[in-house]
């Protein structure tokens, strides 16, 4: 996508169609559904920029164009690709800083390939690329302010840590390593080459505390959802259960190399959807 590429407003649902969260978004009432498709579409476009193999300078420019477009949107003069976001901003009170935080997270991937970040940097990354998405989403779902912030904090981190644990080999293939340096050093891994780390026999000992951390975030997110009306949290509940199930598959598989890819099957997704979609 070039800097000036303009997705048509009607294409938001099509962009979201490939998401594992599509069904969770599709069951929402129309205004919420359309707003979630918009948020997902935005995330997908900036994420594709961050993950592309185009020169870094070009990707930086493309992300800056999105930042400029978000600024224009909040000035009331959106570019064509964000024109239909205005109604969602007014209806749900979506915050500019959350869109910008997502771009900040993508820039962390573009500025340099992330390799063994310290814990603080990893947590900041998770907040930007996952919890910021959650902060936009919980406003659309209709959660109270405090509970929404708490849910996005915990569920966002749970999902992103699960992503990191699932994608160790895929990330290594593009020169990235999101496992924190403190945990690597604790088990004697000093290499920062992602492929070398991915093949290290001590890797399961690095992953174990991240698994526990993700499980704790899932549990904290469940507590927030349990105290809110079922109709308000059905979409995040489905999203969380999808990823909790993936984490359980990862635990069952283990983290020693070689690792077989893990994917949640269609039947499991349907079962989760049927369990939580009907209020």
UniProtKB/Swiss-Prot annotation:
Single GO molecular function: geranylgeranyl diphosphate synthase activity
Keywords from the named record: Transferase
Class of enzymatic activity (EC top level): transferase
SUPFAM superfamilies according to UniProt: Terpenoid synthases (SSF48576)
Lineage: superkingdom: Bacteria
Reactions catalysed according to its record: 2 (2E,6E)-farnesyl diphosphate = presqualene diphosphate + diphosphate
Pfam families named in the record: SQS_PSY
GO biological process: carotenoid biosynthetic process
Pathway: Secondary metabolite biosynthesis; hopanoid biosynthesis
Cited PROSITE patterns: SQUALEN_PHYTOEN_SYN_1, SQUALEN_PHYTOEN_SYN_2
EC identifiers of the protein: 2.5.1.103
Family to which the UniProt record says this protein belongs: Belongs to the phytoene/squalene synthase family. HpnD subfamily.
Function: Involved in the biosynthesis of the hopanoid precursor squalene (SQ) from farnesyl diphosphate (FPP). Catalyzes the first step, the formation of presqualene diphosphate (PSPP) from two molecules of FPP.
Protein name stated in the entry: Presqualene diphosphate synthase
Organism: Rhodopseudomonas palustris (strain ATCC BAA-98 / CGA009)
Lineage, top ranks: Bacteria, Pseudomonadati, Pseudomonadota, Alphaproteobacteria, Hyphomicrobiales
Gene this chain is encoded by: hpnD
């Amino acid at each position: 996508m070039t800097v000036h590429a303009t997705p048509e407003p009607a294409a938001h649902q099509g962009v979201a169609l490939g998401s594992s969260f599509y069904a969770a978004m599709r069951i929402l009432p129309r205004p919420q559904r359309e707003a979630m498709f918009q948020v997902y579409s935005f995330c997908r476009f900036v994420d594709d920029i961050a993950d592309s193999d185009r020169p870094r300078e070009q990707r930086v420019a493309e992300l800056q164009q999105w930042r400029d477009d978000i600024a224009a949107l909040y000035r009331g003069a959106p570019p064509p690709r964000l024109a239909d976001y205005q109604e969602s901003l007014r209806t749900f009170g979506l915050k500019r800083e959350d869109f910008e935080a997502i771009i900040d997270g993508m820039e962390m991937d573009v500025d340099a390939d992330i390799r063994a970040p310290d814990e603080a940097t990893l947590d900041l990354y998770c907040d930007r690329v996952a919890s910021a998405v959650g902060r936009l989403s919980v406003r659309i779902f209709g959660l109270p302010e405090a509970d929404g912030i708490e849910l996005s904090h915990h569920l966002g981190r749970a999902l992103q840590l699960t992503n990191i644990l699932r994608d160790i080999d895929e990330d290594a293939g593009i020169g990235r390593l999101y496992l924190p340096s403190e945990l690597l050093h604790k088990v004697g891994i000093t290499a920062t080459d992602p492929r070398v780390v991915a093949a290290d026999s001590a890797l399961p000992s690095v992953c174990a505390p991240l698994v526990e951390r993700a499980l704790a975030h899932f549990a904290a997110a469940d507590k927030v959802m349990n105290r809110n009306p079922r109709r308000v949290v059905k979409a995040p509940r489905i999203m969380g259960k999808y990823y909790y199930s993936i984490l359980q598959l990862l635990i069952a598989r283990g983290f020693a190399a070689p690792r077989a890819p893990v994917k949640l099957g269609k039947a499991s997704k349907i079962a989760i959807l049927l369990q939580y979609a009907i209020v």
